[in-house]
Amino acid sequence: MTDSTYDVNRVRAYLQGLQMRIADALGAFDGTPLAADTWRRGPGERLRGGGCTRILEAGGFFERAGIGFSDVAGDALPPSANASRPQLAGRGFEALGVSLVLHPRNPYCPTVHMNVRMLIATKPGEAPVFWFGGGMDLTPIYGFEEDARHFHRTCRAALEPFGAELYPRFKKWCDDYFFLKHRNEARGIGGIFFDDFSELGFERSFEMLQSVGDAFLPSYLPIVERRRDTPYGERERAFQAYRRGRYVEFNLVFDRGTLFGLQSGGRTESILLSMPPTAGWRYDWHPDPGTPEARLQSEFLVPRDWA
């Protein structure tokens, strides 16, 4: 979209407030507050700007929980950002957003990812081009239909005020995006995903972004509240490490946010905030038929109409 009528200050204020609200809620749920790490890029670095990382490791519930806010600018969009808009190659940019990944210790509690962001591409003598992106997706280790339906219905409700067609469109986008092509396997049960979005104009597109961000806590906390006291043992933890290995593979090979950060000279600690604290790989391993581990593959890691 080549409309320069946007207000980056309002977007920034919303994102910073969203990070604070989510971090406070997660700290209260865990019983351990998330530490704050404020950072700023130094002179001579490829990017300008800074951000704040809220992080919890080895908490009471979360083995690792990270939620980062960043607002950075650079002289040229990296390839991962203009893959669908080659005409923007070489433009300067500002990118601001909130991204989180939560890794509970209990294998019956799913990993979750959420991101909301805005990018602005600039070129002297031409109107700026802005767009929004984001979404959220759930990655269970053990599948529960009740949880999947709750997550997807909350996502659908967040998008409904902006058009009935958005949820099925963004759900399919999510199913297609969070897919490990080299494994022919989904990362999780999906959710919603969107990028390069400005078709509703700045005001309405920004309202949609806020609705997605605000839906995160009600989409996730009821699920982990239900599962947090489920007993587990070494078998479940071993399968959790195996599934986390798939998470690592996706993030390092396919994830646009990770590639954008690495290609643009971003802050490595923030970029790799999504990595699980432990992960594992087994050679040519397959779960025994009829087990809960096999059921995850056959019933949950396939596209379904959960809502």
Curated annotation (Swiss-Prot):
Organism field? Burkholderia mallei (strain ATCC 23344)
Q: Catalytic activity annotated for this protein?
A: coproporphyrinogen III + O2 + 2 H(+) = protoporphyrinogen IX + 2 CO2 + 2 H2O
Q: Is Acyltransferase a UniProt keyword of this protein?
A: no
Name the predominant localization: cytoplasm
Q: Which Pfam families match?
A: Coprogen_oxidas (PF01218)
User: Do you know which PROSITE patterns this protein is assigned to?
Assistant: COPROGEN_OXIDASE (PS01021)
Q: Assembly state and interactors?
A: Homodimer.
Gene3D superfamilies in the record, alphabetically?
Coproporphyrinogen III oxidase, aerobic (3.40.1500.10)
Give the metabolic or biological pathway.
Porphyrin-containing compound metabolism; protoporphyrin-IX biosynthesis; protoporphyrinogen-IX from coproporphyrinogen-III (O2 route): step 1/1
PANTHER family the UniProt entry points to: COPROPORPHYRINOGEN III OXIDASE, MITOCHONDRIAL, OXYGEN-DEPENDENT COPROPORPHYRINOGEN-III OXIDASE, MITOCHONDRIAL
Chain spans, region Important for dimerization? 247-282
Is Metal-binding tagged as a keyword?
yes
Gene encoding it? Answer: hemF
- Residues that hold a divalent metal cation according to the record: 103, 113, 152, 182
Instruction: Spell out the family assignment given in the record's similarity comment.
Output: Belongs to the aerobic coproporphyrinogen-III oxidase family.
What is the recorded name of this protein? Oxygen-dependent coproporphyrinogen-III oxidase
Instruction: Name the site position(s) for Important for dimerization.
Output: 182
Q: Which UniProt keywords apply?
A: Cytoplasm, Heme biosynthesis, Metal-binding, Oxidoreductase, Porphyrin biosynthesis
Any idea of its EC number?
A: 1.3.3.3
